[in-house]
């Protein structure tokens, strides 16, 4: 293969190898699939070591539904397929404000991984890195400021992000839970109530 053809096959730009930390995105019908992480694992068996691959996938419809999955197989494509199937089965719905951002701040923790997410005004974009960005983008979030601390393990970061998303509640959901009107909840938020106050107060 000629050098020019090889460069075109890599996207027309000589960028070298793809950043292994950047999620690989695929679109399947209405579902966006992102490969967050893949690694080779070894198991000691009689006669030596057996190698396989473990994949971490995130899928979502970019309309408020998202899921994650883990798959292991002796070949990379099969590991990705298993992880994708599991992710689709575990999809959850998260309420979004104006279909673009979170309703309130969110905090999550899993293992040694901690994440913090804040709603942001239009035009902010998704300010988040690695695994967190993959989850938020497949969910459909367009404006958010997110930060992770502690463990950089992608599995911990993804789980911590989902823990933070679990506490997201729309004004309608909070009003129904408390037996109040939506206007009362919105008025309280306008007065500067924090996310924990809005949910637990």
Swiss-Prot record:
GO biological process: translation
Sequence ranges assigned to domain S5 DRBM in this UniProt record: 31-94
Region listing for Disordered, in residue ranges: 1-27
Acetylation recorded as keyword: no
Pfam families: Ribosomal_S5, Ribosomal_S5_C
InterPro entries in alphabetical order: Ribosomal_Su5_D2-typ_SF, Ribosomal_uS5, Ribosomal_uS5_bac-type, Ribosomal_uS5_C, Ribosomal_uS5_N, Ribosomal_uS5_N_CS, Ribsml_uS5_D2-typ_fold_subgr
Keywords: Ribonucleoprotein, Ribosomal protein, RNA-binding, rRNA-binding
A single GO molecular function term of this UniProt record: rRNA binding
Key word Secreted present: no
Subunit structure: Part of the 30S ribosomal subunit. Contacts proteins S4 and S8.
Domain free text: The N-terminal domain interacts with the head of the 30S subunit; the C-terminal domain interacts with the body and contacts protein S4. The interaction surface between S4 and S5 is involved in control of translational fidelity.
Family: Belongs to the universal ribosomal protein uS5 family.
Listed name of the protein: Small ribosomal subunit protein uS5
